[in-house]
């Protein structure tokens, strides 16, 4: 069926559109803010070490020109202000395509408190794993983390849905045949060390990549031994002696190429079959939605079908039980050629 949107009066439409465009601009501003990570100085220091930012790392792995669906970008917004804030909860998660396969990415942002885990960081990481588990998405972890944020460790470690659940999920997904892949692109200390160790296949970068439960200062305090990070848990140690990591990389770029090679050799079958029918643009531009939605959407009634026609392919949808339970609209439609409800 084709539905033609019923537009509200022009003065109301313009007022609504102005209001919602302002909300959209505020959202974009917030998204731009969190993408700055820990701030200009932290980013400069990060780059000076030859390290890329988490979103830059993800883009290096994705198929050229393919989209990345970032999840929970505003997690921990306006929280932990006493600690200076934790943009995006200090971790970037989302779904992207590698050799045509949708994969779940979890990338620590070391410019934000050294990539350490706050309570909301754990929650965001677990949410990404849950989505991956439900949809059988291979997981790619770009690890650059100092483990738990120690001043808040009592809120990070103890419960069944806290930090340890991350490793439990990795074990369950691996056992279920969902690939777990890691690129160690920075320090992996304490809890952060378990993520690559529990993956099915991992890559570690020479120099910046390290894996150990306790770093050189703690080793010195406990044993009196002076040891460098590289000798304690660097790329050479873990690829030639301990066997914790599987692949040695001279640079991050080489590491990301190896990650792509790993995905290419998974013999992985994507669950969803793609619809090859031609894509039809909606009959009505999405921009008009701003004018249809009332400013006070919980008080002013509007027909949600008008919104649907601006979103679905060809503005076509098949409504289900139209005369029953009329406060809810259920329908079948295609969105970018993907069939759904």
Task: Give residue spans per PLM region.
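Conserved catalytic cores of soluble enzyme domains
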Residues: 143-271
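A short, small-residue-rich loop immediately preceding and capping a beta-strand
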Residues: 103-106, 114-117, 137-142, 175-188, ...
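Non-catalytic terminal/interface segments that mediate subunit docking, oligomerization
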Residues: 74-104, 124, 133, 298-341
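N-terminal amphipathic, basic-rich helices that act as targeting or association modules
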Residues: 1-102
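Terminal amphipathic helices with adjacent charged low-complexity linkers/tails
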Residues: 246-308
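Flexible beta-alpha connector loops of hexameric P-loop NTPases
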Residues: 111-120, 152-160
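A conserved hydrophobic secondary-structure block that centers on an alpha-helix together
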Residues: 112, 118-140, 146
């Amino acid at each position: 069926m084709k539905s033609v949107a019923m537009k509200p009066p022009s003065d109301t439409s313009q007022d609504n559109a102005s209001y919602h465009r302002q909300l959209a601009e505020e959202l974009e501003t917030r998204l731009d803010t969190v993408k700055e990570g820990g701030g200009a100085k932290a980013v400069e220091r990060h780059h000076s070490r030859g390290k890329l930012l988490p979103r830059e790392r993800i883009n290096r792995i994705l198929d050229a020109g393919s989209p990345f669906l970032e999840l929970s970008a505003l997690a921990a917004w306006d929280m932990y202000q006493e600690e200076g804030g934790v943009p995006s909860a200090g971790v970037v998660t989302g779904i992207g395509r590698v050799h045509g396969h949708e994969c779940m990415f979890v990338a620590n942002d070391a410019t934000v408190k050294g990539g350490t885990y706050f309570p909301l960081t754990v929650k965001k990481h677990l949410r990404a794993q849950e989505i991956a588990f439900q949809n059988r998405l291979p997981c790619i972890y770009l690890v650059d983390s100092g483990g738990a944020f120690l001043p808040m460790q009592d809120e990070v470690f103890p419960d069944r849905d806290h930090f340890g659940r991350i490793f439990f999920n990795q074990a369950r997904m691996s056992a279920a045949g969902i690939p777990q892949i890691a690129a160690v692109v920075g320090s992996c200390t304490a809890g952060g060390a378990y993520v690559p160790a529990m993956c099915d296949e991992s890559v570690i970068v020479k120099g910046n990549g390290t894996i150990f439960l306790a770093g050189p200062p703690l080793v010195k305090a406990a044993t009196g031994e002076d040891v460098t990070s590289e000798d304690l848990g660097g790329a050479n140690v873990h690829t030639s002696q301990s066997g914790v990591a599987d692949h040695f990389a001279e640079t991050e770029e080489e590491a990301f190429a190896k990650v792509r090679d790993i995905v290419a050799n998974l013999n992985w079958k994507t669950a969803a079959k793609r619809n090859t029918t031609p894509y039809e643009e909606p009959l009505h531009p999405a921009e008009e939605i701003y004018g249809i939605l009332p400013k006070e959407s919980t008080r002013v009634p509007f027909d949600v079908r008008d919104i649907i026609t601006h979103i679905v392919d060809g503005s076509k949808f098949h409504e289900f039980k139209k005369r029953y339970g009329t406060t809810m609209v259920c329908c079948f439609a295609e969105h970018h050629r993907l069939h759904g409800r």
